[in-house]
């Protein structure tokens, strides 16, 4: 798990709907379900928040990184 996900787990321990909101967004089914579970009790909301965080891990955008070729004819080129 990424450090951002661990931070969300820490937030979920205190306020589960806030962690789900930060992870999935405001107008989502996950937030509505978590809020309803949180109204039923703290532990159902916590378990659902941990489930949402683990099912949707943080992924860095690797499209902004490009790999350089190993051939010598491209030495010094940027593309």
UniProtKB/Swiss-Prot annotation:
Name of the coding gene: SNA2
Q: Which PANTHER family match?
A: HYDROPHOBIC PROTEIN RCI2 LOW TEMPERATURE AND SALT RESPONSIVE PROTEIN LTI6 -RELATED, PROTEIN SNA2-RELATED
| UniProt protein name | Protein SNA2
What sections of the protein cross the membrane? Answer: 7-27, 33-53
Spell out which residues lie on the membrane's Cytoplasmic side.
Answer: 1-6, 54-79
Q: What is the lineage of its organism?
A: Eukaryota, Fungi, Dikarya, Ascomycota, Saccharomycotina
Task: Write down the superkingdom of origin.
Answer: Eukaryota
Q: Where does this polypeptide localize? A: Membrane; Lipid droplet
A cellular-component GO term for this protein? cytoplasm
Organism equals: Saccharomyces cerevisiae (strain ATCC 204508 / S288c)
């Amino acid at each position: 798990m990424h450090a951002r996900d661990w931070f969300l787990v820490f937030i979920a321990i205190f306020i589960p709907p806030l962690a789900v909101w930060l992870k999935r967004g405001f107008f989502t089914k996950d937030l509505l379900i978590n809020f309803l579970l949180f109204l039923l009790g703290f532990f159902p909301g916590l378990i659902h928040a941990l489930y949402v965080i683990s099912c949707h891990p943080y992924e860095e955008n690797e499209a902004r990184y490009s790999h350089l070729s190993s051939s010598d004819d491209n030495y010094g080129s940027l593309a």
